[in-house]
Amino acid sequence: MNARQAITPALVTEKAVKRLPRWALLLFCAAYVLPGLFGRDPWKNADIAAFGQMWSLALGQASWWAPHVGGVPPSGGGILPYWLGGAVISALQPWVDPALAARLPFAGLLVAVLSLTWYATYHLARTEAAQPLPLAFGGEAPVPDYARALADGALLALMATLGLLQLGHETTPEMLQLTGSALFTYGLAAAPYRAIKARLATLFSLILLAGSGSPFIAILLAVVGLAVCQRSTEDSMRQHLRWVLLSGILAAGLATGLSWLGLSGWHWRVSGMPNIGAVVRLFLWFTWPALPLAMLTVWSWRRQALRRHIAVPLLSVLIGFGASLAMGGLDRALLHALPPLAVLAAFSLPTIKRGLSSAIDWFSVFFFTGTALLIWVVYGAMYTGWPHSTANNVAKLVPGYAKAFSWPLLLMAAGATLAWLALVRWRTARHQNALWKSVVLPAGGVALGWLLLMTLWLPLMDQSRSYRLLMERIKPHVRVGSCIAAPGASAGLLTALEYFGHYSVDGRANSGTKNCEVLMLSVGGKQKAPTVPGWHLVARERQRTQNSESVAIYRRDH
């Protein structure tokens, strides 16, 4: 028995590497990426705040070297994400709505993250240390088929993570950061097989991270890359070291330049000790089901923990976990851990026990079927008024909800539900040998839930999470085109005033109050509107209920 046979936990037959049909994989990806891309407004809070910075660049209201909305610069995110969104808005106007134009490149980034995770897993699974045990009488899995099956599993595991669902569909700098992280993992994975592509990926990955507000994570990844390349016995990895070093130097230089310009380059965002219970809950739901599978991988492959197929994703995951903890349990920092966590989860599939696999399957069946049923019941209540209690709850949560029935959206939702039932029947009706079988139901359930929300509930969610309703309530009190001083207002509210209300806004501390005839202050749901010397209160409007966000509108005394 050689060394690899002694320490490799995987035993995989040729039947187990059954290929997931490409049409099915593409359908999964389409059902995950496309819903929510069309037919909605920018949503609160980070989504519309980032969109506002991009829109102001496209309109020429702000310098490309100093983006701002109403004089308020972005709170983070570097500069590259705003350039990306602003450039696409500028290129597609006036033919495409600015909000949709801004979402298009970020949907492309989500596709890139999914693709990079697939290819990173594929190349890592081809390494000698990752191969399963050879069978005594033959019939073991061919290397390309084995690698492809694990890559399919990694992609499904990534789509199944609940944390990527909302944040992955936003127009925010975190998506460019996530692309940079995934690109770096791909570079380390593909270096022995696709040298030129791997070098280019590594070179640009850390630059993307530094230019989108995560220079510290870029430097930590560079340290990981240098360590992996330095201890590798492969010449290709040793040669790759210089590209990791060059990328790290360029990333540090870019972050320094952004800081010199007054942007979020070396922006220290470490906060105090987070609540341990809250962090544990965040990590559990945000990373489900990839985290338990990744933990199984670390245990099963513990004797190969220093090999590249385990070390690269594991160290990247630890960086993402550490960044989230350092920022007080920030969920957006935890995004960095998801692609490498999915890669790690894929290597558990050859070793997973039938009991754990069945538990994941049945949990997915009951949880996602129940979620889909709830979505359908609420949808029916919105249009029929039955069940009465459900319809009343919807009316309380979104007062004045305007029904917007759509046959195409209804048919899409019905088709997705039938596809889910067919997938459940396929998975549970007979024993399946494919390695990726344990993650197909979680991925399918997440895709189903997201598609139902973005079809059946899209009008409801759009009215509850968009600023459009609040702007409609403000218009009777403030003439379109008026100048509004809104000191202390969030970038999201400033964007809404310009985009939905067509007002001229100034969010700076004192300058706007000298030039504008209207003053607007954000007021807590139950707080009393403050008295402002030289101004008289005209109205107070709320987004939805008595406890929701509200604004107080003042006019200057004459």
Each language-model region and where it sits:
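Short helix- or helix-capping micro-motifs
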Residues: 154-159
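Extracytosolic helix-loop segments that constitute the early lumenal/periplasmic catalytic or substrate-binding loops
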Residues: 50-76, 80, 87
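Membrane-embedded architecture of ER/inner-membrane glycosylation machinery
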Residues: 3-26, 174, 191-558
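Membrane-embedded alpha-helical segments of multi-pass membrane proteins
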Residues: 104-112, 175-183, 336-344
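Transmembrane-helix motifs of polytopic, lipid-linked glycan transferases
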Residues: 104-142, 160, 183
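Loop-to-helix entry region of an early transmembrane alpha helix in multi-pass inner-membrane enzymes
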Residues: 79, 83, 92-120, 144-151, ...
